[in-house]
Amino acid sequence: MDQKRLTHLRQLEAESIHIIREVAAEFSNPVMMYSIGKDSSVMLHLARKAFYPGTLPFPLLHVDTGWKFREMYEFRDRTAKAYGCELLVHKNPEGVAMGINPFVHGSAKHTDIMKTEGLKQALDKYGFDAAFGGARRDEEKSRAKERIYSFRDRFHRWDPKNQRPELWHNYNGQINKGESIRVFPLSNWTEQDIWQYIWLENIEIVPLYLAAERPVLERDGMLMMIDDDRIDLQPGEVIKKRMVRFRTLGCWPLTGAVESSAQTLPEIIEEMLVSTTSERQGRVIDRDQAGSMELKKRQGYF
């Protein structure tokens, strides 16, 4: 990696660490959202750097839908234990009682009940006034226009037309009781930055990001990896072993794999540099309707 690129990564690192420390100093009850993906792994690494040699002054929160890949759950528990982090896991009890799942109820309803409502329940339950998230501006157009300090009202709603100015790295965290701030320390990072930083810092990631032979089937233009037996095959569908990996991770029925032979970080970086598609092309929830991500964020989604 050339010196110019290395300096760029260190500038991003310094900015993110500054934001994380600022939130810890300014808010009374912050939390770090932990979705187990590559961005969460980088954000957690930066937080550990920010407070080294001490422990994190806030817990990790995973809003569990019950449909993550098994390797993600294993990685989550192992990581929290290894780093001595307080891990809070919340699953929407109403959604569980209703038996909500992406196959029967569809991606939009599943996401709304198990993720958006689950997140709002958890934030209210613990009274968090600031929540870190690993979203980046290059991922999706609604995220591109969101501030680093993203104000949410007492109903957790985001108004993109009423955002606070952020001049010269000055962030406005003033809130009233019941309101909160979503904080995005990785806003100015790109997918390329994330992968090169993971390689530079030797950050552990979920093995699903690396190519391997996995059982998949084609459905709705997506390669779906079959992670357990909670699926009913449709006529003509056949499960086959194919060499695939994931560019983004979520609920396994809603996350498409990509055919790939990249089994190392340098190979992933090389593959990504020539890719002409978004990393979120495999996320079914982004296709629900036009502007679906912005609508979800207005309703309280991260």
Swiss-Prot record:
MF terms in GO: ATP binding; sulfate adenylyltransferase (ATP) activity
Example of a GO biological process term: hydrogen sulfide biosynthetic process
Alphabetical list of InterPro entries matching this protein: PAPS_reduct_dom (IPR002500), Rossmann-like_a/b/a_fold (IPR014729), SO4_adenylTrfase_ssu (IPR011784), Sulfate_adenylyltrnsfr_sub2 (IPR050128)
Top-level taxon in the UniProt lineage: Bacteria
Major enzyme class: transferase
Key words of the record: ATP-binding, Nucleotide-binding, Nucleotidyltransferase, Transferase
Family annotation (SUPFAM superfamilies): Adenine nucleotide alpha hydrolases-like (SSF52402)
EC identifiers of the protein: 2.7.7.4
Catalytic reaction list: sulfate + ATP + H(+) = adenosine 5'-phosphosulfate + diphosphate
Pfam family name, one: PAPS_reduct
Stated role: With CysN forms the ATP sulfurylase (ATPS) that catalyzes the adenylation of sulfate producing adenosine 5'-phosphosulfate (APS) and diphosphate, the first enzymatic step in sulfur assimilation pathway. APS synthesis involves the formation of a high-energy phosphoric-sulfuric acid anhydride bond driven by GTP hydrolysis by CysN coupled to ATP hydrolysis by CysD.
Subunit (UniProt): Heterodimer composed of CysD, the smaller subunit, and CysN.
Family: Belongs to the PAPS reductase family. CysD subfamily.
Alphabetized PANTHER family for the sequence: SULFATE ADENYLYLTRANSFERASE SUBUNIT 2
Stated name of the protein: Sulfate adenylyltransferase subunit 2
Taxonomic classification: Bacteria, Pseudomonadati, Pseudomonadota, Gammaproteobacteria, Enterobacterales
Gene name of the record: cysD
